[in-house]
Swiss-Prot record:
Its main location: cytoplasm. This is Putative pre-16S rRNA nuclease. Keywords: Cytoplasm, Hydrolase, Nuclease, Ribosome biogenesis. It comes from Ruegeria sp. (strain TM1040) (Silicibacter sp.). Gene3D superfamilies: YqgF/RNase H-like domain. SUPFAM superfamilies: Ribonuclease H-like (SSF53098). The keyword Hydrolase applies. HAMAP family: Nuclease_YqgF (MF_00651).
Amino acid sequence: MIHDAFEDFAAALPQMTALVGLDFGEKTIGVAVSDRIGAVATPLETIRRKKFTLDSNRLLEIIAGRDINGILLGLPRNMDGSEGPRCQSTRAFARNLSRVTDLPIGFWDERLSTVAAERALLEADTSRKRRAEVIDHVAASYILQGALDRMRHIRSS
């Protein structure tokens, strides 16, 4: 089930659960996973997009192998908060994904996540080639970590 409101997504999840975070792009899908207590997001891999069936099969393999209980997609809003074509693509991907899994699917505002990931990689003195290889799944971990932090705040209130 797709949850547009993050609070609804958080409420649909078990208390202690692992999540997968996705940075959905035109050519790639950055993938990050959380630990089972939902405290730390870790970059996992970048999927080179091909066809939806192949992409979703790889995601479902990751989900099955890591006991994931929720899917979080970064929503690439414009800087003014409006939704453009990239948001529409992300929402369409979520709708298609909801047809192949019963896991709750939520969204997290991903504005500037790639910028933050790029900055962190530059500070770590990562080569340009290596940055290009890992930027998407590092951005996915930034997206997922932001959501995990918010979820912890919601649950402690």
